[in-house]
Amino acid sequence: MDIVNLILVAVLIALTAFFVASEFAIIRIRGSRIDQLIAEGNKAAIAVKKVTTHLDEYLSACQLGITLTSIGLGVLGESTIERLLHPLFVQMNVPGSLSHVISFIFAYAIITFLHVVVGELAPKTVAIQKAEAVSMLFAKPLIWFYRIAFPFIWLLNNSARLLTKAFGLETVSENELAHSEEELRIILSESYKSGEINQSEFKYVNKIFEFDDRLAKEIMIPRTEIVSLPHDIKISEMMDIIQIEKYTRYPVEEGDKDNIIGVINIKEVLTACISGEVSVDSTISQFVNPIIHVIESAPIQDLLVKMQKERVHMAILSDEYGGTAGLVTVEDIIEEIVGEIRDEFDIDEISEIRKIGEGHYILDGKVLIDQVNDLLGIHLENEEVDTIGGWFLTQKYDVEKDDSIIEEGCEFIINEIDGHHVAYIEVKKLQEEELLETANQQEA
């Protein structure tokens, strides 16, 4: 009889392991991976899809199975092990009442160990590491159990719903649980550390998260750097400009840069000249296409949607007074995700961030404060300006080359000035000895 009971104990432990492994596997498996396997013709994946589509019901089935097998294991296992151990303690001349207690303690410990290790921990570990294989193997048996136990599962689920409603709580489906942006960032970081995604993928997805927070004024070409063409300029005069600037599109002004009336595409003008439709003595006014104007504080995601809708590649940004603050191109927006894009004419273009050494950089004055913070792991803040050059000017209004500021353990040095504009700033993280030396010099 005890042999039969031991076999039943082993079966109950195996069933516990089955339900535990099934529970963790169906939670762990990715829906996109299941869809891929179904597309490849994997029939087992269809059963997995059915289970994950009705996740709440099948998780309840797993919980019911674990509970039933655990109760059965406690009732049957402890009494069986206790009966097997009791004669051993009697032979050791342990008093009867004491041998019964010791047998019970040993039986309880053995069953608990087997239940936790063999029935819970080991299956859970396997299911987490091999979620795909486990879910493929166990999906069909789990469906059979669900069908058999459906009345009980239905009763338990509805009883749980009534209980939660009695406390004024709504039942939340497992499928309705969504990750916040911060949670997704943590998952992304962990996936990168574990090697599931590479550095480029990690960088792109992070940039997409940051994309929503970017404003047009943070990525614009400022008014002072806009190369615009007068609306009445001759094509021959335009040729002299485009040989130097080498842009494909130019904003067209009427009077000054505060009155941008449109944009021209050089390809369109040159094609018309080559075909003989116009002469080089004609003005560019007939080639002016509409351009959109938006406030400089517009989010770049909204601006991109508007540019796609209007089918334009350039937008003029206006300040609060209606003047031109700068311009943004589709390329500028895309670069916020994929990084810097350079064409065949950008060979001599200098990178905005040049690394000199460890913690030592030359920064373009137009680099955003947020980028500098991320680069150096510091927390510079200023609500009035967006760029590092602007930040320096708010700290020290009358600046000259080689002027320096120490902030957040870093030294910022004016590397180059272009008129009233900070062109380049050298920044380096200071060691503790350098910080102490600088502090002593300032006190002296």
Swiss-Prot record:
The keyword Magnesium does not apply. GO terms for cellular component: plasma membrane. Residues 220-282, 284-344 form the CBS domain. It is found in: Cell membrane. The chain crosses the membrane at residues 7-27, 61-81, 101-121. PROSITE patterns: CBS, CNNM. It is a multi-pass membrane protein. InterPro entries: CBS_dom, CBS_dom_sf, CNNM, FAD-bd_PCMH-like_sf, FAD-bd_PCMH_sub2, Ion_transp-like_CBS, Transptr-assoc_dom, UPF0053_domain. SUPFAM superfamilies: CBS-domain pair, FAD-binding/transporter-associated domain-like. Keywords: CBS domain, Cell membrane, Membrane, Repeat, Transmembrane, Transmembrane helix. The keyword Nucleotidyltransferase does not apply. One of its GO terms (molecular function) is flavin adenine dinucleotide binding. Pfam families: CBS (PF00571), CNNM (PF01595), CorC_HlyC (PF03471). Residues 1-201 form the CNNM transmembrane domain. Belongs to the UPF0053 family. This is UPF0053 protein YhdP. It comes from Bacillus subtilis (strain 168). The gene is yhdP.
